């Protein structure tokens, strides 16, 4: 087909646009990835010797980048080893799944293996669904097929790309030099175009990314149908955004149409001959599935008798580019959309719809051509937003699904790019993709479900190679192995004390900060540990469980009951020392007391060999060797090795004098000073 003056003018505009885009991309500096571990990893792998002034600087730079990537001060040796193994594992994956797994950023080897196994199962199931009916027939798919899989089919053919080619016949009808078009034919094609299914088959589309481009044949093939009810439920800002994105999408399709060779599909009319289009067969590249009338829908005949499916309560509204930009005014004859609060919208009359469908008549109205964008080929049929791959489109379409579910309900948490949208959406549907069949508990990720199911099966696949103990989670195994290796990776930045577990470090840091996050709701007293709060709360529960007739007291558990009961009945405590007759309420107190008689000192200092009868005395003694002073004054910054010394020091700031003389009433901050003062009264 010869190109007219209008076509040459469009090619000139295309060249100018490409040069402008290239200049703009050259002027913009590359964005700084920042100091995150991922950025350091990327810089570490791409570092070149020429970037440094010399070998010493190159080595120093590599050490700095590797340190920023692996974070040895925060990770253990096992975690660093697992990170390196995970990187190599992702590198050796097959090309068809490597990029998809890397985009999901698995945090452990176990999670990466689970993702690869899921993808392999889905790819195998896809290959089984490809049905070949002989040469020259179509490939019918229940789901979009990756390009690599489609190429294996004998019926999938790719024609060589032509260097110079005029637009396709259907697009030429819209963009041709003649502004006169048959509005009746445009309306027929628009109304007969199939509706895109919003929901993909359950559990398949999210894991399958379309690697090949999927292009519509012409502008009418990507006309989007939105019911007036759905359009009315959108707020003004979202309507404006939809218009902008639809216009951008049409411009992309316009620029792509002239570069893609057409593929004739049997049974589908792409010209102007007036033949019927068969809606029961879809082209593989369109990515559409055949659809018949669903329950509650009825067929209607268009002007040439082509059947199309439409819901009885939804009027299809075709968003052509001029309407998407808001340049085509809504006349009283055509009607205009109202807000959902009014609820009195009526479909436009037959003649008005015909005029609206014939509104865009020239290439100028479709916007300037843009450069070929192979990474934006998947259009949302509801808002017109463009996506680089099919999995992102499916994930985006669930937003519209949730909007339909939440009409009339307060579901504002779904919008605004909430990262937990998928979980909220599944909660609205009353089901989740990953559900435990034993207890019914639902999870947002398959790896979480696998970890949970081990609580039912009792499976413990992670075994310690030293003692043979098994664990259900890899993290629990790493934590256990520190008891054998003596590793203590968590260090207190204040005093330098090291710990094997992060929870112990957090508990220790409260000594320095004075934080007491556990507060009693009865009296307001705060505690640094939850166990201390539990013990304290029992003092407020006097009316519970075990009342006494002798003293009217009540205790919260059976152990104090037995102790108090023995004090009332036998006038003695439960644990009595056979040597001196002294009694104790707890067995551990009796054991500690008996060491004063036996002279036993089971706790030995490894540095000087001195023995102690109590573990607390050994810990206090070891601070003499280490010089550790974990107790810091927040007023002046002084540090102390014992908590009692810090408490005594704090009284110099607060002015507290808790020791009072019973003779004259004078108060003192230390008990030793009170004792010295009392000697003045006794002589």
Swiss-Prot record:
| Gene3D superfamilies assigned | 6.10.140.140, Classic Zinc Finger (3.30.160.60), DNA breaking-rejoining enzymes (1.10.4020.10)
Q: List the disulfide bonds.
A: none
User: A GO molecular function for this record?
Assistant: DNA-binding transcription factor activity, RNA polymerase II-specific
Phosphoserine modifications at: 166, 178
Indicate yes or no for the key word Disulfide bond. no
Quaternary structure annotation from Swiss-Prot or TrEMBL: Interacts with a number of proteins involved in chromatin modification and transcriptional corepression including DNMT1, DNMT3A, HDAC2, PHF8, TRIM28/KAP1, SETDB1, EZH2, UHRF1, CBX3/HP1-gamma, and CBX5/HP1-alpha; recruits these proteins to the SIX3 promoter region, leading to SIX3 transcriptional repression. Interacts with MAPK3/ERK1 and MAPK1/ERK2.
What does the function comment of this entry state? Transcription factor that binds to the consensus sequence 5'-TCCTCCC-3' and acts as a transcriptional repressor. Binds to the promoter region of SIX3 and recruits other proteins involved in chromatin modification and transcriptional corepression, resulting in methylation of the promoter and transcriptional repression. Acts as a transcriptional repressor of HS3ST1 and HS3ST3A1 via binding to gene promoter regions.
Instruction: Report the protein name in the record.
Output: Zinc finger protein 263
Q: Which species expresses this protein natively? A: Homo sapiens (Human)
State the organism's lineage.
Eukaryota, Metazoa, Chordata, Craniata, Vertebrata
